[in-house]
Amino acid sequence: MDPVRVAIQRLAHCFALPTCAHPGDAGLDLFAAHAVPLSIAPGRFTRVPTGIALGLPAGYMAFVQPRSGLAARHGISVLNTPGLIDCGYRGEIQVLLINHGEVPVVVSRGDRIAQLVVLPVPQVQFVEVSTLESSERQTGSFGSSGY
């Protein structure tokens, strides 16, 4: 598979460009790019700059997703998971981090704070119908597959 070329702009306060921790990883680590450490109190959230802007090609989008290690160790997640970046957005990528833990968490410049996943976007054409075809699941929703 050929790599997708994504334009990236390093802003003045950028710490590092997104990187994959391991070959073949789907998510690229995003780094905090603020000048002073930020403390996130339990139950609170804050916006963390990454110091980068993207030029996603037409037909692509990106998700900003939590890092599992931050969630497991500190209760830190991305508030609007997943954060959606459309191909036309050219501003700085910022991450809304929320502290679901019980103690304040300090985020410092250079910390890996989230993951960026770039995906193709299919063009959708809705076809209005009077009824939908049957399915095995039908209208089962929350908890329909068991608890």
UniProtKB/Swiss-Prot annotation:
Membership in a protein family: Belongs to the dUTPase family.
EC number: 3.6.1.23
The protein, known as: Deoxyuridine 5'-triphosphate nucleotidohydrolase
Gene Ontology MF terms: dUTP diphosphatase activity; magnesium ion binding
Nucleotide-binding in keyword set: no
Alphabetical GO biological process terms: dUMP biosynthetic process; dUTP catabolic process
Cofactor: Mg(2+)
Functional pathway: Pyrimidine metabolism; dUMP biosynthesis; dUMP from dCTP (dUTP route): step 2/2
